């Protein structure tokens, strides 16, 4: 974090100050174009904290878990008991396989504080200023990664007007796209955004671009944010997560072959109403 620390994303006060020194400055400078030539604000990989665990029961290592100043007070208001009296249950399993409600409640409250402080506040500000909040959270793919960094991904999507995902390294993460699409449907949003093609290298050809875009479109992605177009590739920039979808790539003038295809698909996907008759229970809370 450039020699500093990460912001406390569970603190409403901290995020309100973040909005004041960033979003408000954007509004002062280019607010007349909000909702016009500047349709969205993109947030990239917000997270709580990379939660750590002991490697074994008698491990003496120092580990870190998400916390904020008034966490014990808001926890007690929500669940009716003092978490500090149950702290060992966050780190160690109970005997005889007994499930710890305190551990579940800790993860639940951590995620809710995160969603309220960051996404609810940022989303509210964006609505009040006629601009769409979009972007994606950190570590979306599976139950472990979400618990590790977020609590859960789907709860955070409520603050987005356009929920998004990130697909790096030519990965295929079906549940990542599907849970974002599901949240978009449930919250009444118009589509799903994907940041895609990051870390695919200079050799990634149009077949790869089409494949990645096709399977994501099939799972509900309607808006594409390309990673990325460089201003310059001087110095070490030329090794910074290529390729550049711009003049640095010899094929950039032919890229319309790819984008014309997805423009037609997106048009079709955004002109209908989802007809969903199957419900799948997301097991993230059971994982906690």
Question: Model regions: which residues?
Answer:
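Carbohydrate-binding surfaces of carbohydrate-active enzymes
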Residues: 28-40, 45-288
């Amino acid at each position: 974090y450039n020699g500093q620390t990460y912001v406390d994303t569970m603190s409403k006060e901290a995020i309100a100050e973040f909005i004041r020194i960033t979003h408000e400055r954007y509004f002062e400078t280019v607010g007349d174009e909000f909702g016009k030539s500047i349709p969205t604000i993109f947030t990239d990989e917000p997270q709580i904290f990379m939660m750590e665990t002991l490697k074994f029961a008698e491990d003496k290592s120092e580990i870190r878990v998400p916390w904020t100043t008034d966490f014990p007070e808001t926890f007690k208001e929500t669940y009716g008991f003092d978490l500090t009296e149950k702290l060992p249950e966050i780190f160690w399993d109970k005997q005889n396989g007994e499930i710890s409600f305190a551990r579940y409640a800790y993860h639940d409250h951590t995620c809710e504080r995160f969603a309220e402080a960051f996404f609810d506040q940022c989303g509210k500000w964006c609505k009040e200023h006629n601009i769409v909040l979009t972007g994606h959270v950190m570590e979306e793919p599976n139950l472990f990664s979400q618990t590790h960094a977020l609590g859960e991904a789907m709860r955070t999507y409520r603050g987005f007007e356009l929920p998004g995902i990130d697909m790096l390294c030519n990965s295929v993460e079906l549940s990542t796209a599907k849970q974002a699409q599901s949240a978009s449907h449930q919250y009444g949003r118009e589509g799903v955004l994907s940041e895609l093609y990051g870390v695919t290298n200079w050799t990634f050809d149009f077949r790869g671009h089409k494949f990645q875009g096709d399977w994501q479109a099939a799972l509900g992605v309607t808006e594409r944010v390309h990673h990325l177009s460089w201003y310059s590739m001087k110095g070490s920039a030329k090794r910074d997560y290529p390729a550049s979808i711009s003049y640095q790539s010899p094929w950039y003038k032919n890229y319309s072959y790819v984008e014309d295809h997805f423009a037609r698909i997106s048009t079709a996907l955004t002109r209908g109403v989802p007809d969903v008759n199957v419900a799948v229970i997301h097991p993230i809370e059971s994982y906690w």
